[in-house]
From Swiss-Prot:
Name of this protein: S-ribosylhomocysteine lyase
Entry-linked Gene3D superfamilies: S-ribosylhomocysteinase (LuxS) (3.30.1360.80)
Signal peptide: none
Subunit structure: Homodimer.
Cofactor binding annotation: Binds 1 Fe cation per subunit.
Family of this protein: Belongs to the LuxS family.
Keyword Membrane set for record: no
Coiled coil: none
Gene: luxS
Single GO BP term: quorum sensing
Amino acid sequence: MAKVESFTLDHTKVKAPYVRLITVEEGPKGDKIANYDLRLVQPNENAIPTAGLHTIEHLLAGLLRDRLDGVIDCSPFGCRTGFHLITWGEHSTTDVAKALKSSLEEIAYHTEWEDVQGTTIESCGNYRDHSLFSAKEWSKTILDQGISDQPFERHVVE
């Protein structure tokens, strides 16, 4: 079975919240795709409940695209501690951390239910499992801790 980088990471050594560049893959024509670890809570110490994580996911899908060029996808980890962000091309972890911080600020302090995309039976595969209240509270908690552009030491972005 192929080795998966995420499963070789020592989850006891990282210091969340942080942004980490996992890999940059190059396609046969030179196209580059970057994969980032957007870790919002400390692994094995906490996990974001599914309804809040689901709402954060739907909001980040649009908010990160507004702040970073080339966003392909932002999908939650099964462990519920953060997200994979996939982009065309490579951004610095500082730029990604700043975009994440700005997006979480928008969620925490400015987002209303009407702003959440994909919350109907037609547009979401689990439309009943959302909580804007939880998304806002978790966003505030994460922002209070600061988002680092380094996974193993705290280097909080402004």
